[in-house]
């Protein structure tokens, strides 16, 4: 995707915020527990390479990604010796590519290990489906057979075993406890404990630090975002959001009563009012459902009017502004703030989706 460096729309990523979130989490972990930075989906929209560098500087001991291509991008960017785990499914024909690049893969089916052609040792992490219902083995028999396969094949190393909690971001813990118990049953069925046992995502690491095992997978909260609104007041430390989204007014004009804007003419002025056109739209991740939400101009709220277009959006101004005036879509402006949580609430989604939607057409600028 082409990045729009010649357009006045940009994302600022505060590296100091990422470092602070990591340090605060590390301070509550036992020294024996590693923190792995989850940088999948372009680091949740924050930029995979720069976030990985920042996380490593802050003390992260490795990285988790969703697909092999993300792991290879890290290797190509200079992370040659760092631990990298692919959490999602990888094609069998790509196993050798992962092995040659010392990338750990998730295994969740016995048949995946059959007839692999490897030129180097492949490190695998056994995924246990303890109740999430996506990927993973579900019985002790499966776990023992996969362990036996890896033991008998000198080119396979059962490096880790893990699970993922479905309700760690909820205050009610009964289902979480059921999952943990099932995982522990499968873990104890193995003859040898793998090097890495890991279960905790951001929510679990924040609320259930006792189940850190050997490593935690620190994702959404590394970026300063709360795993869910339900647990926001129960966090052990304040999270610092790292992402802000800005643009500038490229056209300012006054509407007369009866004038309409954007596709479908869904918004019509009832009085004289000032509006501005912003060079950002749903092709950038500012989806059409943002219509009716608001931005900040000079610290004041300005509603998004009419339909969000592919490349442009129109806002109603509280008064006349100069062309080129800065607009805050996510972030702080003169003491007021619009957060990813605010946008998520309006869009009826979660903060993860808000930032992940912001694609690479918007340039990232890294500060601090």
From Swiss-Prot:
Q: Name one GO molecular function term.
A: pyridoxal phosphate binding
**Cellular component per GO, a single term:** cytosol
Q: Which domain of life is it from?
A: Bacteria
SMART domains (alphabetical):
Ala_racemase_C
This enzyme catalyses: L-alanine = D-alanine
The UniProt entry, under PROSITE patterns, shows: ALANINE_RACEMASE
Supply the alphabetized keyword list.
Isomerase, Pyridoxal phosphate
* Pathways involved: Amino-acid biosynthesis; D-alanine biosynthesis; D-alanine from L-alanine: step 1/1
Top-level EC class as recorded in UniProt: isomerase
Segments forming a coiled coil: none
* Enzyme Commission no: 5.1.1.1
| Residues that coordinate or bind substrate | 134, 310
Which cofactors are required for activity? pyridoxal 5'-phosphate
Question: Which InterPro entries did the record assign?
Answer: Ala_racemase, Ala_racemase/Decarboxylase_C, Ala_racemase_C, Ala_racemase_N, Ala_racemase_pyridoxalP-BS, PLP-binding_barrel
Query: Which residues in this protein are found as N6-(pyridoxal phosphate)lysine?
Result: 40
Q: Does the keyword Isomerase apply?
A: yes
Q: Which family does it belong to?
A: Belongs to the alanine racemase family.
What HAMAP family does this protein's entry cite? Ala_racemase
Function per UniProt: Catalyzes the interconversion of L-alanine and D-alanine. May also act on other amino acids.
Name by which UniProt lists this protein: Alanine racemase
What organism is the protein native to?
Listeria monocytogenes serovar 1/2a (strain ATCC BAA-679 / EGD-e)
């Amino acid at each position: 995707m082409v990045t729009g460096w010649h357009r006045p729309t940009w994302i600022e990523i505060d590296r100091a915020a990422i470092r602070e979130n990591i340090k605060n989490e590390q301070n509550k972990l036992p020294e024996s527990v590693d923190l792995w930075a989850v940088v999948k989906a372009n680091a949740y929209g924050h930029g995979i390479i720069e976030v990985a560098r920042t996380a490593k500087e802050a003390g992260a001991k490795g990285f988790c990604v969703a697909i092999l291509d993300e792991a290879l991008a890290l290797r190509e960017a200079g992370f040659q010796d760092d631990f990298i785990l692919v959490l999602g499914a990888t094609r069998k024909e790509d196993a050798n590519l992962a092995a040659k690049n010392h990338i750990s893969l998730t295994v969740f089916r016995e048949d995946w290990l059959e007839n692999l052609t490897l030129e180097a040792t492949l490190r695998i992490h056994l995924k246990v489906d303890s109740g999430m219902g996506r990927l993973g083995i579900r019985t002790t028999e499966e776990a023992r057979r996969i362990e036996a396969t890896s033991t008998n094949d000198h080119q396979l190393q059962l490096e880790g075993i893990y699970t993922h909690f479905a309700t760690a971001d909820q205050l009610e813990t009964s289902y979480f406890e059921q999952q943990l118990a099932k995982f522990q049953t499968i873990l104890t069925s193995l003859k040898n404990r793998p090097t890495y046992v890991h279960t905790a995502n951001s929510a679990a690491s924040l609320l259930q630090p006792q189940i850190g095992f050997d490593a935690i997978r620190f994702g959404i909260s590394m970026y300063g975002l709360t795993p869910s609104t339900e647990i926001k007041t129960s966090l052990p430390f304040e999270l610092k959001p790292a992402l802000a989204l800005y643009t500038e007014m490229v056209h300012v004009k006054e509407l007369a009563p009866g004038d309409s804007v954007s596709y479908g003419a869904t918004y019509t002025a009832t009085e004289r009012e000032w509006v501005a056109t912003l060079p950002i739209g749903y092709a950038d991740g500012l989806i059409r459902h943002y219509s009716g939400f608001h931005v900040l101009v000079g610290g004041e709220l300005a509603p998004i009017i009419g339909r969000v277009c592919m490349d442009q959006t129109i806002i109603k101004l509280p008064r006349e502004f100069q062309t080129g005036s800065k607009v805050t879509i996510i972030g702080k402006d003169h003491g007021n703030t619009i957060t990813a949580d605010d946008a998520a609430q309006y869009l009826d989604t979660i903060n993860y989706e808000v930032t992940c939607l912001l694609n690479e057409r918007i340039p990232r600028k890294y500060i601090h």
